[in-house]
Amino acid sequence: MQKKSGWFKCHCGSNKNPVIKILDEMKWYNGTIIPYDANSKKIMSYCGDVMQKISKKAKDQPICCVDFMVRDIANQKSLSQAVEIEHQYNQNRTGGLMFCPYKTPDLLSAGIEDMIELFEEHDQIFILKGDKVYKLHLTLESIHKMIMN
């Protein structure tokens, strides 16, 4: 399945997540290192190790990865910790697509500062409402230019 599409399809996160079970059934590579603990004090290092494991396994294929780790970190620790991990990943990106599905309550409870930082770490942001997908556009605006126009 992975070779036909050209993408190395993978995921990482807790095995308790029902979506991970579905991805496993679809033969997506599970890059999670066991034991998995989103509350670990060395979570930054752990996430780096997971990304290295995935990159090594993918070889030269572009990666299509669903990362549930950052969602778990935002939920169990803080959104700011998840943003810090995303920022670190962005310093040394792998080729391909990385999907980071967050829970809306985790975003809304974090505050606008952390939410904006999270959005700045992503190329695109989507919100799912029922069966509809909305794309958010976030741009930094100059207050002076807005007033002058």
Annotated model-derived regions:
Residues 1-149:
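Non-catalytic regulatory/interaction regions at protein termini and inter-domain linkers
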